[in-house]
Amino acid sequence: MAAFDPKKSDKNLRKHGMPLPACEEALDGPMLTYEDASEEYGEQRFVSLGWAQGKVVVMVWTDRADGPRLISCREAERHEQKAYFRAYPSR
């Protein structure tokens, strides 16, 4: 089970239309992941394309000692969906 900040989840729901727990199932499936090194966050952050709620989602998360912590999630844009389906055509 992934951890998340409930206030951040509410903010994510307002901004992107989905609460953070809605993306959690993507952590259990195939994901395209890269490190987000665009800023100095003080911890290693990842951006992943995964499958949750019947669609491709984009998650920002960090891997902590007690497991993954979700930072944000949203439905993938068209170019991101194409990249995911190229990597995982059986989806």
Task: Enumerate the predicted regions with their spans.
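Ribonuclease/tRNase effector modules and their secretory precursors
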Residues: 1-91
